Amino acid sequence: MTHSTLPPQPFAILAMPRTGTHYLEELVNEHPNVLSNGELLNTYDTNWPDKERLLLSDRELLERAFLRYPPHSDKKVTHVGCKINEPQFQERPSFFAELTAWPGLKVILVIRRNTLESLRSFVQARQTRQWLKFKSDSSAPPPPVMLPFATCEAYFKAADDFHARVVYAFDSSRIRLIEYERLLRDPVPCVATVLDFLGAPALQLADRGILRRQETRPLDQTVRNFHELRVHFANGPYARFFELAND
């Protein structure tokens, strides 16, 4: 692989699961100088041909991500990144500290306003084993799911703790928050914000993405015990996750 004199500037997309990071990455990768290589810590991510990389030390794995990344023949890469989801940090506890110490790293933290939507989507994907849906896919939406009280509470707390941990760990100049809802509503200006933050040249993206949302129905149609959950979490810090558009 041919590199420029200076190594590409590194970035990482961090998020809870099911927050639109695949879509964001797809759009960012339309830029001829930006390359995001998928989930670094995911054994099955096809962007990384070598599963053995996960046997490397944390430092060596980051070198693999930012210095010895898989080649991409049609790009002159000036900014290179990867994605990491919160559960993957749990599986590799020492990795977060090594990531925060990487010189010059910029972080894009993607947040979904309604964490219940994130959990519901995560459970649906695990149960159906369907993690992505493409625009050409006309299959039926996934079946509704049951979500135990304890599972919801643990997930809500994990999301709060993770977001706080990331914000606390990085200087404000090195982190940019992106809302899932804004990304869906206004993808082009949202990606322009990301590119400006990274320092990549401005580019009018075509939004030729091939991904689509797997689930568009409201929560009361996709979570079988939604109303029981709503009562359980009423008047608490997570009550807002159970508000419906027609309330």
From Swiss-Prot:
Assigned keywords, A-Z: Nodulation, Plasmid, Transferase
Top-tier EC class: transferase
Record carries keyword Chloroplast: no
Entry coiled-coil feature ranges: none
EC number: 2.8.2.-
Single Gene Ontology MF annotation: transferase activity
Transferase found in the keyword field: yes
Hydrophobic: annotated segments: 1-17
Entry function: Required for the formation of sulfated nod factor. Proposed to transfer activated sulfate (PAPS) to a N-acetylglucosamine of the nod factor.
Listed name of the protein: Nodulation protein H
Organism taxonomic ancestry: Bacteria, Pseudomonadati, Pseudomonadota, Alphaproteobacteria, Hyphomicrobiales
